[in-house]
A protein has these predicted regions:
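Alpha-helical, coiled-coil/dimerization segments enriched in small aliphatic residues
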Residues: 208-235
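Structured C-terminal subdomain patch of bacterial secreted/periplasmic proteins
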Residues: 146-156, 230-231, 252-331
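Short helix-initiation/N-cap motifs at beta->coil->alpha
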Residues: 21-23, 79-90, 111, 231-239
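Solvent-exposed loop/turn segments at secondary-structure junctions
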Residues: 41-44, 61-64, 100-101, 106-110, ...
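Bacterial Sec-exported substrate-binding components of ABC uptake systems
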Residues: 1-45, 158-198, 313-331
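Proline-aspartate-enriched helix->loop->beta-strand connector
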Residues: 89-103, 240-256
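A short, structured surface patch at a secondary-structure boundary
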Residues: 39, 43-96, 100-101, 105-109, ...
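Extracytoplasmic ligand-binding site segments that recognize negatively charged/polar headgroups
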Residues: 64-66, 107-115, 125-158, 191-214
Length: 331
């Protein structure tokens, strides 16, 4: 990732940095002090690089503070200015007077609420878009234009430059890469198990993640194959009938308010399309916290946790890999 610093005066003040975000070169403050962050995965990015005290508002983190505290500590998480449990409005963002807004399409930005990068830029606020949520075309609602690990590395590098924590960001990226290499060196199954991510669902469809979402690379890093690897999107809805064709060996749940693990299991066991799937019949389920599934530094913790679970279910050989952090959830 190439960053270009400038000491010339601009709308951002005397010091700016030019970064590439969603394929576009844009100027940002090089030492942003007031960052409005939406969603727990992006809060995790900021905390991981030591920029927590530069968060002026944090929204959309209701129900995820315990998961964040397990990794970043209760003191750091309790100090977050939790403005609201819900996603922000344009008025709320403007009222916080941020230098930078950190959000994504489907993660706070949306045309229906008029909270868009374009609207913020028109009002003098630098708008950063979560790379996982980048759109291939401005009028295309499908998200995802790059490999999820590449998206995460890009965001950490960019946010390091914008907040003045470049070295810290490099250390986080290096640590993730080291742990990924350890997972890649682990012994593999002769036939890799198929894993399905279930965020939520009803009798007709499941909200899940395609090949541009974090679960794709998490599942792959753990030594398995994603049941939705052929879906060209990040987070999206597909039919249970399509899922049933993949015959998943293990089902992983995204622990997220609105539908408990028990409710998801009951749905799977009652649905004719899923009740006889290997994962359901053998009750091979793994429940992991939301910030570890969505694009964040915790993705590697999710991969280590899933690897351990696959070994427990005898889906892959023993490796000796242990999760560094506990990102499981009771549900």
């Amino acid at each position: 990732m190439t960053h270009t610093s400038s000491s010339t005066s601009s709308a951002f003040g005397p010091s700016t940095v030019t970064i590439t975000n969603c394929g576009a070169r844009r100027a940002f403050p090089s030492h942003a002090r007031r960052v409005f962050v939406n969603d727990s995965n992006m809060v995790a990015m900021m905390l991981s690089i030591g920029a927590g005290d530069q968060i002026v508002a944090a929204t959309g983190i209701k129900g995820q503070t315990d998961a964040l505290a397990k990794v970043y500590g209760h003191r750091a998480v309790s100090a977050l200015p939790d403005s609201d449990g819900s996603y922000p409005t344009l008025e709320q963002v403007l009222g916080a007077r941020p230098d930078v807004m950190l959000a994504g399409y489907g993660y706070g930005y949306g045309e229906s609420t008029h909270l868009t990068p374009e609207e913020l830029r028109a009002r003098g606020i630098s708008a950063y878009v979560l790379s996982e949520s980048c759109r291939a075309k401005s009028d295309d609602k499908a998200r995802g234009v790059m490999d999820p690990w590449t998206a995460l590395r890009s965001d950490l590098s960019n946010l390091g430059a914008v907040t003045g924590h470049t070295q810290e960001a490099r250390k986080v990226v290096k640590d993730i890469d080291t742990r990924r290499r350890a997972l890649a060196r682990a012994p593999q199954a002769s036939t890799k198990p198929t894993v399905l991510m279930v965020d939520s669902g009803d009798t007709g469809s499941v909200f899940t993640s395609g090949r541009y979402g974090g679960p794709e690379v998490i599942i792959k890093a753990a030594g398995a194959v994603s049941a939705t690897t052929d879906v060209a999107n990040t987070w999206t809805t597909i039919s249970w009938e399509k899922i049933a064709q993949t015959r998943p060996d293990v089902i992983v749940f995204n622990d997220y308010p609105g539908q408990t693990k028990a409710q998801k299991v009951a749905l799977l066991e009652a649905n004719p399309a899923t009740k006889n799937l290997p994962a359901v019949k053998n009750r091979r389920f793994v429940n992991i916290a939301y910030p570890a599934w969505t694009s964040s530094p915790l993705n590697v913790d999710a991969a280590e946790t899933l690897r351990q679970s696959l070994e427990k279910y005898r889906m892959v050989p023993a490796s000796g890999i242990k999760p560094r952090h506990d990102v499981t959830a009771r549900g």
